[in-house]
Regions:
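Sec-dependent N-terminal signal peptides
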Residues: 5-15
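Flavin (FAD/FMN)-binding glycine-rich loop and adjacent Rossmann-like elements that form
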Residues: 136-139, 144-155, 162-173, 177-359
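Aromatic pocket-lining residues of Rossmann-like dinucleotide-binding sites
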Residues: 41
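Conserved N-terminal/central alpha/beta ligand/cofactor-binding core
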Residues: 46-47, 52-146, 192, 201, ...
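N-terminal Rossmann-fold NAD(P) dinucleotide-binding loop
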Residues: 34
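Beta1/beta-strand and adjacent pyrophosphate-binding region of the FAD-binding site
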Residues: 21-31
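Sec/Tat signal peptide C-region and signal peptidase I cleavage site
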Residues: 16-20
Length: 359
């Protein structure tokens, strides 16, 4: 009987500890939203665990999106305002207040990816007694990866991508800071993917729409609902500084036919801007002759040089945040190929990520 009681006690201990150390907050995703949630919680005396799938934290700002997308900087407050201030202070300390780097950081809204990651780590490090960050932890959003009590998440299982083993964590509150919404989906939170129909909420710009960039909907636009999601790309940190350059190798699976149409795009000047509605075939042929004679494109809306392919935003130290060129037929996006991403496995996502990188 005594042995039986001991065994029961051991089993009971395993069951209550099966989801490991408990935190006030368990945050899935080391993106800016997750990082800032942990920092604010720490300043309120709460403990947090951040589980990040990749080896780097910081999400988009630490991976190429160095030119902050914000139309009204006056609306910047809170922890993001603190982040931009720290960015600017870093460039002032390192290069001097009158340096080109400080000018190019645009009051802290433009930054090199490595600087963004450094600032995030600095802010997290100030709360190291309250915040635990674990990288290379993958949540597979499958049955058994969440422990639920009714509709409340109380535990999570992740894969340690370094060891291949499972790890279990519990928390009072769980935050989904992934770009995909994987935690919410796994917890059966209702969601929808794609564009709603024009008439569902009486939105004239909703649904399936075709148009030139910055134009009005063109013929063929139905306004119907579909499963389309915004195209994805890599924000390219390029440079004009020879000493900072890294060679870009030709991918093994490079397919020339995917880019052949770019030759005609360059010669004729054709693009996706609204001005193309008024461009004639005669104008494009005249543009072709001018370029073949050593001139530059004069077609309305056309870009020249590398900006034919990407939109260049200046960052400090001669670097760039190169985004998709919305005015081009071929750029860094792969529209429609990415549509399965939100609900696909990590195996599919990794394959698409490589496909996009190679492209």
């Amino acid at each position: 009987m005594r042995l039986k009681n001991i065994l029961l006690a051991i089993i009971f201990c395993f069951s209550i500890n099966s989801y490991g150390q408990q935190f006030d907050l368990v945050i899935l995703g080391g993106n800016p939203g997750g990082i800032m949630a942990a920092i604010e919680a720490a300043r309120m005396g709460k403990t947090s665990l951040i589980l990040e799938r990749n080896s780097h934290i910081g999400g988009l700002p630490a991976n190429g999106l160095g030119a902050t997308d914000i139309a009204t900087r006056g609306a910047t407050t809170g922890l993001f305002s603190e982040f931009t201030r720290r960015v600017k202070d870093y460039y002032i300390r390192k290069y001097g207040i009158d340096s080109q780097q400080v000018k190019d950081c645009s009051d802290g809204f433009h930054f090199e990816p490595s600087v963004a990651e450094m600032i995030f780590k600095e802010m997290l490090g100030e709360q190291k007694n309250k915040i635990t960050v674990l990288t290379q932890r993958q949540f597979n959003f499958s049955d058994g990866d969440l422990q639920m009590k009714g509709t409340k998440i109380i535990g999570i299982r992740v894969v340690n991508r370094t060891t291949g083993g499972y790890e279990y964590y519990s928390g009072k509150i769980f935050i989904d800071a992934t770009y995909e919404g994987d935690l919410g989906a796994a917890a059966h939170v209702p969601y929808r993917i794609g564009r709603e129909a024009r008439w569902e909420f009486n939105e004239p710009g909703a649904g399936r729409t075709y148009e030139y960039w910055k134009s009005e909907p063109a013929e063929g636009s139905t306004g119907d609902a579909d499963n389309a999601v915004q195209a994805y790309n890599y924000r390219l940190c390029l440079t004009s500084e020879p000493s900072l350059r890294a060679n870009i190798k030709k991918p093994e699976n490079y397919h020339r036919e995917e880019f052949v149409s770019l030759i005609e795009d360059v010669l004729t000047g054709r693009n996706t801007w609204k001005y193309m509605r008024d461009v004639t075939s005669e104008m494009m042929e005249a543009n072709r002759k001018a370029i073949l004679n050593g001139g530059k494109s004069t077609l309305p809306g056309d870009s020249w040089g590398i900006q034919k392919l990407v939109t260049i935003n200046t960052l400090p130290n001669g670097k760039t945040d190169a985004n998709n060129q919305h005015g081009a037929f071929i750029s860094t996006d792969l529209p429609e190929e990415n549509w399965p991403w939100p609900t696909s496995s990590w195996e599919w996502r990794d394959k698409f990520a490589k496909r996009l990188k190679d492209y």
